[in-house]
Amino acid sequence: MTQKLTITRPDDWHLHLRDGAALAAVLPDTARQFARAIIMPNLKPPVTTVDQASAYRARILAALPAGMAFEPLMTLYLTDNTPPEEIVAARASGFVHGVKLYPAGATTNSDAGVTDIRRCAATLEAMQREGVPLLVHGEVTDGDIDIFDREAVFIDRVMKPLRRDFPELKVVFEHITTRDAAQYVAEAEGPVGATITAHHLLYNRNAIFTGGIRPHYYCLPVLKREIHREALVKAATSGSPRFFLGTDSAPHARGLKEHACGCAGCYTALHAMELYAEAFDAAGALDKLEAFSSFNGPAFYGLPRNSGTLTLTREDWELPAELPYGDTTLVPLRAGETLRWKAS
């Protein structure tokens, strides 16, 4: 049984850092484990221009504690009105690494998202030409589609036509949650990748309802059936370079999670690599963790691997019950429980 594992320093290819006091509270958790992260642009207002991304990047770097090294990889928020010229500027900037597609209303702060992907044709053509990846929240938002089917329907309605019309466009299917998505990404032609969260590797939808409503397990896309969790584990541990780490760590104040209309999102930045190690260990695939965490993402984005390392040790430790979060608190996933791995 492996007791210690040292891997190339990993990256997080899907992260929510928020802004202001919330940013300052959560950024150190990510920077302790990850060298770089793709930063989601769904602030209020959303980050839709290169100038806004530059300003947000500056705020992130200003919030980084002294002595910590971390590179934020910025993204733009795609709207019906994003001009192709903004894509050219994004490519030239050197710090914008993707454009995020949120179907309007799909998740937190997505109201300004795309209402019809066909309206973005000229912009998508510019992205294909400039080599700027499209990062996709892969769910339809039609009220007549069951919430557990939104991802599968998205593949047929949006992803397949998108890939047909823009076959050379780099596409990341973010935080996949279904067997359908894992199979689609594995078999798709052209430059397609996918991020997978730790919580979707570890839990199925029963976790939300065990002994009562468990709001800290509620995220979007929502946890699915066990057959889907198993398919995600198989994909993540397959060795395929198309699958890579993206925590989708999404902090919300405790009062906004434990609420009559609670927010979606699991906070895992504090203990992300410990959770991934647990999932890969349970699958008997610790030898595949480094590629998933540290190699596949940089290869897809055309970036070099990190030079540092991170060590995971089989060691019991108790996760805090809550964490400071501005003038309130934040509850990490599995708060107060014992974890079996420790990252250093």
From Swiss-Prot:
Residues modified to N6-carboxylysine: 100
Swiss-Prot/TrEMBL catalytic activity: (S)-dihydroorotate + H2O = N-carbamoyl-L-aspartate + H(+)
Residues the record lists as binding Zn(2+) 1: 14, 16, 100, 248
GO cellular component assignments: cytosol
Protein EC: 3.5.2.3
InterPro entries associated with the record: Amidohydro-rel, DHOdimr, Dihydroorotase_CS, Metal_Hydrolase
Keywords, sorted A to Z: Hydrolase, Metal-binding, Pyrimidine biosynthesis, Zinc
GO molecular function, one term: zinc ion binding
Pfam families on file: Amidohydro_1
Active site: 248
Residue numbers binding Zn(2+) 2: 100, 137, 175
Residue ranges crossing the lipid bilayer per the database entry: none
Known cofactor(s): Zn(2+)
GO biological process terms, semicolon-separated: 'de novo' pyrimidine nucleobase biosynthetic process; 'de novo' UMP biosynthetic process
Manner of cofactor binding, per the entry note: Binds 2 Zn(2+) ions per subunit.
Residues annotated for substrate binding in this entry: 16-18, 42, 137, 220, 252, 264
Pathway entry: Pyrimidine metabolism; UMP biosynthesis via de novo pathway; (S)-dihydroorotate from bicarbonate: step 3/3
Described function: Catalyzes the reversible cyclization of carbamoyl aspartate to dihydroorotate.
PANTHER family given in the database record: DIHYDROOROTASE (PTHR43137:SF1)
Similarity annotation: Belongs to the metallo-dependent hydrolases superfamily. DHOase family. Class II DHOase subfamily.
Subunit structure: Homodimer.
Name of this protein: Dihydroorotase
